[in-house]
Amino acid sequence: MKIDIIENRAECIIFSSQFGSGSAVWCGGDMTLPGSYDVEIDFDSEYIWGENVFYSNVPEESISLCNGVNKINSKVISIDGDIVVISLGCDVIMVEVSGAGVISNEHYIFFNSPAEMTSVTPFSN
């Protein structure tokens, strides 16, 4: 995913992307502010279907930041056990979701990811 880093805070960065704005832990070396980076994004919270992961009625992929929490809306590509593969544009992301067996492919889901449980790792600087 291509992101533009807007701000570097003590614990996390604030970024913007074609999907919206978010906050995450930076898992790379030095960065340039402002700076653009191609990154891998990971959501590492404990997700449980029906408790903090739900179907979405909004058929679009987005990231928004509200009170330090990333709100993710994404399309389900596939499910393998408790691993849900989602897309944000051309980017494919695996998220572990307990009870994922009831989720259907090609539907959109919504979940929250606190900034401290979201990480971005640059592919190159």
Named regions from a protein language model:
Residues 1-8, 58-81, 107-111:
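Structural detector for short beta-strands of small beta-barrel domains
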Residues 18-32, 88-119:
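Beta-strand/loop nucleic-acid-binding surfaces
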